[in-house]
Amino acid sequence: MMTFYRTTRLMLSSAAVLSFASSAFALDGNDLLKKINDIYGQQGATIAAQGVDIDGSTVTLKGASFKAAGMDDSIPLGDITLDGVEEKDGGYTIEEIDFADVDFNKDGAAVSATDLKLNGVEIPADATKGDLGSLLYYKSAHAGAVSVTKDDVEVFSIEGADATMNKRDDKSGLDFDAKINGIKADLSKVDDAKAKEAIEALKLQQIDGTVAMKGSWEIGPGTIDISEYSFDFKDIGKLNLAFSISGYTPAFAKSMQEALKTVRSNPNQQEAQQSAGLAMLGLLQQLTFNSAKIRFDDASITGRALDFAGKQQGVSGKQLADTLKAMTPIMMAQLNVPELQNAVSTAVNAYLDNPKSLTVTAAPGKPVPVPMIIGAAMGAPQSIPQVIGLKVSSND
């Protein structure tokens, strides 16, 4: 009997210890939600949940909703499931976040989205430190099909989208890329007569293309280098934007967020906007311009645009192109930069004769402080091409 008693007491004691240990190491769902909102709160946004359920390492935000700054109503998100949640150094790591499918109606349009998820998510313990570890990070993001329907007709859709981020091993920065595939828009149902005429003349009733981005962020000097930000649409063309600036450090981003937060909290919006403008001018002192490039590769839209614009003026597309070629050097002469005038005239002439590509490049010999560019634009606009090393070329 004594043996049974001792055994029972040992079992109960062990159960109590295990129960205490379990509660001590259980995830705190409310703390997790708070830390998520610490991040979004910097942009004036919040994520709310009607309840937080925990099952092992899985946290479910029940009846979640999102509200951004300036929004009157929240966007319902449904249940958000966070799998593989672990507390780490006061913050959290999450293997995968799955969002409920989106399906709602707004202003007569039905919007749906499926297969929304994030992988390899890191929630910082302190979002105010101003370093790489204080940022919301995810290794990959994915969205499945997205559709917008109006009057039972699909007017816009996306086949899918993917994005990745990669922290450098030396913690010096991030590399990232994103792509939206199968973007389709139906413009054939546009009601406005003039817009409909232009859409039909340009053959833009059905738009089909992709959007892609690739770049990096070096934390120390705050260098953001976007090597690709492209819009590539069938039978239209591909527009690619690339640029590089320095000075956009986490501290700069934090200062900008605080300035915007001050604007949002000030009931006198006119006064707030003026204060924000002054604050932004001060922040711009920290930025430098490294380079930029805009390139358009034509896929037949230029010819249709010339024909349509020429028709509006009672001339052919060829005649309009000849007029533009004649006007270009006259317009460029106002800048009083002969070298640029000749380069632009040559590029425009070649492009209008045989539309293939048009490229505008800004590559100064050394990085230029952004305030210097603003000052030149205000005081001596004609000096801008020399300040930023502006060049124009075509069909190269």
What are these regions (language model features)?
Residues 1-26:
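Gram-negative bacterial Sec-dependent N-terminal signal peptides
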Residues 20, 27-396:
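Glycine-rich, small/hydroxylated-residue low-complexity segments
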